[in-house]
A protein has these predicted regions:
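Metallocofactor- and cofactor-centric catalytic cores in central/energy metabolism, strongly enriched
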Residues: 1-285, 292-374
């Protein structure tokens, strides 16, 4: 009975108590099935993605466990880190198993190096930062018929506020922008960004067709059952996460966010692959809208789960952080919810609120493989 009566919701202060390293939120394990048996493009992409995670502002350091003979060579990773951050100075320990005298010794060394890294990481103390340092990922998954008229436009309004205040936002999932390309092209401030976006969309669409599919197959059975019967309908709602701001940059997968304002990032429509890509490009917070319910998170960027309707907020209250269903019932407007969401995002970024995905340790990490296994 005592266990059942204990509080299930932990606050940021609860989580921080009794830690050996109070300034370190935790150690996250990123495992993957890449690195070998793939084309060189995918192994290079994996190194760029890992470099993005290592240089992410939320990450204090890393211990890399390498086999030693794989396509994703350590030197490629090191070059990717140096390219992203020429002044990189975080603790970084790289161990190769094929150079170790035994697996036990290999693991022992990894633990020792990680502990030394934790000592250094704990010296970093949270300090106030301007909103211009915020990079917010804009994500959706398990969308329903309400997503495009509640959660997504509310997030879009918050995105516009962040842009106006000097921050950056990142809209991903290119297959779910099919049908609204022209609107986004018209919003590209630079002609080269408009052409890059159109070029990536054409190439992505052609590749989907070449394997016997196409963007029209993006809607899931759940999407269709709830009214999103075509990709264009789904895209019309998904694009609203980007608000009305002008597009400042267009990025291919793993490219780093370098410009404040609205960015477009090429990722697949798969929730976890896309969220993985957002953090790899530099997002330090991710807002994730859902109408049907999607229990996913990220190892390094807190994911704020937003419900599009009241029923979902009640049914899956263990994973939902922010409800926009009150827009549907007329209790709130897109503007009021967007402003409330901005305050919530700032509290999460400040460490004052711990989203459900963090509390539940939903540390999902799936790199996108564009090529084939060899």
């Amino acid at each position: 009975e005592e266990m059942m009566a204990s509080p299930l919701i932990k606050t940021a202060e609860d989580i921080k108590q009794n830690r050996t390293f109070p300034n370190v939120d935790g150690i996250k394990f990123l495992t993957h099935d890449g690195g070998c048996g793939c084309d060189r493009g995918d192994s290079d992409t994996l190194c760029n993605l890992l470099a993005g995670y290592i240089t992410n502002p939320n990450v204090a350091g890393a211990t890399i466990l390498s086999l030693g003979c794989q396509n994703a060579e350590v030197k490629i990773l090191e070059a990717a880190i140096a390219k992203r951050d020429p002044n990189f100075s975080k603790p970084l320990h790289i161990l190769e198993q094929q150079k170790s005298k035994s697996e036990r010794h290999f693991i022992e060394e990894a633990v020792k190096k990680t502990f030394l890294g934790l000592i250094e990481a704990d010296k970093v103390v949270r300090k106030p930062a301007p909103l211009s340092k915020l990079v917010l990922g804009l994500e959706c998954g398990g969308s329903d018929g309400f997503s495009g008229i509640s959660a997504n436009p509310a997030l879009g309004y918050a995105s516009d506020l962040i842009v106006a205040l000097g921050g950056a936002t990142v809209l991903s999932e290119f297959p779910e922008l099919n049908g609204v390309e022209q609107e986004l092209i018209n919003r590209c401030e630079a002609p080269e960004n408009a052409e890059k976006f159109a070029s990536i969309m054409r190439a992505y669409s052609a590749k989907a067709v070449s394997i016997g599919s196409g963007f029209e197959n993006n809607p899931s059975p759940g999407n269709i059952k709830d009214g999103l019967i075509t990709d264009a309908m789904k895209s019309a709602g998904a694009a609203k996460k980007g608000g009305t701001s002008l597009v400042q940059d267009v990025l291919d997968y793993t490219e780093r966010v370098t410009k404040n304002g609205l960015n477009l990032l090429c990722t697949p429509g798969n929730d976890v692959e896309s969220t993985t890509g957002l953090a790899g490009s530099g997002c330090n917070v991710i807002a994730f809208t859902t109408g049907l319910g999607t229990p996913t998170g990220n190892p390094v960027a807190p994911v704020i789960k937003m419900s599009s309707n009241n029923a979902l907020s009640e049914r899956m209250k263990d994973i939902i952080d922010f409800n926009t269903g009150t827009i549907i019932t007329g209790e709130d407007t897109i503007q009021t919810k967007g402003e409330e969401l901005l305050d919530y995002i700032i509290e999460v970024a400040s460490g004052n609120i711990v989203p459900a995905a963090v509390r539940l340790e939903q540390n999902d990490f799936i790199p996108w493989k564009r090529g084939i296994s060899l």
